[in-house]
């Protein structure tokens, strides 16, 4: 895979420019997925992209997948370090479809719920809905996003080598490392994403650019 050195800001500008290009058959809203393990810092690129879009006069709404965790009773049903549950049961994908994607489908309302569950209090956040106007861009970021057939108009996977992932993951979360290895094998985010970013050193990312499909 050929990679080009680039800054996060320049990457965001390139992504924003791609989203500005006219496309056939698109709805009133565009959906972007920025996928990567927690150690990959997907929120950094999400914020940079939102800023780049706003500078172009576009509305942008950033949603973190971490705001859609399942209640603790479901996440820890089979123990606090169950890899299978982490892969398939930690994130409330049904709520993401219902509260994030359905409102931004053609004919949707644009009323997006920015988060649903607070894992610290283990209670609903009760956040108000955010209104994303037509022409706006929804940016969803977080781990394990590319294995659910989410309808992204543009997807980015931030990849870390196994060594970098282990170094940058808190030791208390090292039990999740096999989950990300399985995700890489089974869902193939490095090949399915529209753009692949290598960020072993977050100060010096490199990427493929936006790949033609």
Per-region residue spans from a language model:
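ATP-dependent NMP and nucleoside kinases share a basic, alpha-helical "lid"
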Residues: 123-169
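Conserved nucleotide-sensing/catalytic segment adjacent to the nucleotide-binding pocket
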Residues: 61-64, 70-122
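Post-Walker A helix-loop "phosphate-sensing" segment adjacent to the P-loop in P-loop NTPases
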Residues: 51-61
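NTP-dependent small-molecule kinase module
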Residues: 1-18, 22, 158, 163, ...
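A glycine- and Lys/Arg-enriched "phosphate-lid" helix/loop adjacent to the NTP-binding pocket
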Residues: 80-87, 150, 154-188
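Conserved beta-strand scaffold positions in the cores of enzyme catalytic domains, especially
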Residues: 31, 60-62, 153-157, 196
């Amino acid at each position: 895979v050929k990679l080009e050195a680039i800054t996060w800001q320049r990457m965001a500008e390139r992504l924003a420019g791609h989203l500005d290009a006219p496309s056939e058959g698109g709805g009133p809203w565009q959906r972007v997925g920025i996928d990567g393990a927690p150690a990959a810092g997907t929120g950094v690129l999400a914020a940079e992209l939102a800023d780049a879009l706003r500078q172009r006069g576009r509305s942008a709404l950033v949603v973190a997948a971490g705001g859609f965790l399942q209640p603790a009773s479901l996440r820890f049903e089979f123990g606090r370090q169950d890899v299978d549950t982490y892969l398939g049961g930690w994130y409330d994908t049904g709520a993401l479809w219902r509260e994030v994607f359905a409102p931004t489908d053609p004919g949707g309302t644009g009323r997006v719920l920015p988060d649903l569950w607070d894992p610290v209090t283990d209670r609903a956040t009760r956040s108000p809905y955010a209104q994303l106007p037509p022409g706006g861009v929804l940016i969803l970021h977080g781990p394990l996003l590319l294995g659910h057939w989410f309808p992204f108009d543009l997807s980015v996977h931030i990849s870390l080598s196994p060594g970098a992932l282990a170094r940058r993951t808190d030791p208390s979360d090292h039990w999740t490392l096999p989950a990300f290895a399985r995700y890489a094998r089974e869902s193939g985010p490095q090949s399915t994403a529209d753009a692949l970013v290598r960020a072993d050193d977050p100060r010096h990312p490199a990427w493929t650019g936006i790949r033609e499909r």
